[in-house]
Amino acid sequence: EKNYISKAQECYRHAEKKKKPGVFGKIFSNREERMSEAAELFKQAANYYRLGKDYKSAAEAFVQCANCVPEEAHQHYSEAGNLLRKVNTSEAIEYYNRAVEMLASSGRIGMAAKLRKQIAEIYEGDDMLGSAVQNYEHAAELFELDNSESTANSCHLKVAELSTQDSLDSNTILKAIKLFETVGQRYLQHNLTKFSAKDCYFKAVILFMANEDIVGAENALQNYFNRDPSFETSREGKLAQELISDIRASNVNSFESHLYQYNNITPLDRWKTKVLIKAKNMLNAYEEPDFS
């Protein structure tokens, strides 16, 4: 590793000399050629630093590459970001953001979208859900512009799940419901994804329950059954019907029993569990109106 570092330092020194030559060097050499050669040496330095596991220095060498050849800067900023992810995620994001802006402004929307999604994944991994949601939203917009519907859908679902994992206030819930409905409808349009629609619709229904809107849950469920008849006969569709009936009857034991039976066969993930716990609160809040 020490040998790699010394080679990296040597390349870096040569690159700096190419970048800032003396008076005679400036007179007798072409600036564009000098910068191109300097960039190549900085790149070599970066790769040697990488082999020597000095990721911060490797990233700095790629940043110097970007300064030498601005037309390729997005590529070098992206490389710097990849290296810094190992040591400093906030610095990595800074360089990823620069790369995204350059890619988007030059019309390379697909590449910008992929990088924006990477940023979102870093924030999600660091449990910074608000920032993750913002970046997944932006990534979804870019994927839509690039006509990459499948990846856009996955980003929309991330927004819906992470935003409601972070906060179950009414506005956040309603936005998430719309996203689940939109993606569910899109899934139904393709044979490969139509069987995934029921999961989107189930998540939307339990969000209505968590929002203490039993009428909305009933109406939505009927609407989803009309759109996707297979949902009505699925375990998720039946569970949604049973939970609504339990809430209507203010029957906590039955609500818990139905969830227990379902969970024994198909374990509920953390997100569904959190939403269903909030939905269970409706059993305390909901009472049938007394018309006697």
Description of each model-found segment:
Residues 1-70:
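Internal amphipathic alpha-helical repeat/solenoid segments
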Residues 2-6, 10, 29-36, 56, ...:
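Residue signature of alpha-solenoid helical repeat architecture, marking inter-repeat boundaries
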Residues 4, 11, 35, 41-42, ...:
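TPR repeat positional signature
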Residues 16-17, 46-47, 54, 66-67, ...:
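Amphipathic alpha-helical segments of tetratricopeptide repeats
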Residues 32, 51-52, 71, 86-87, ...:
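Structural motif corresponding to the intra-repeat A-B loop/turn of tetratricopeptide repeats
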Residues 92-172:
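Solenoidal tandem-repeat scaffolds enriched in leucines and small polar residues
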Residues 137, 149-292:
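Structured C-terminal portions of repeat-based eukaryotic scaffold domains
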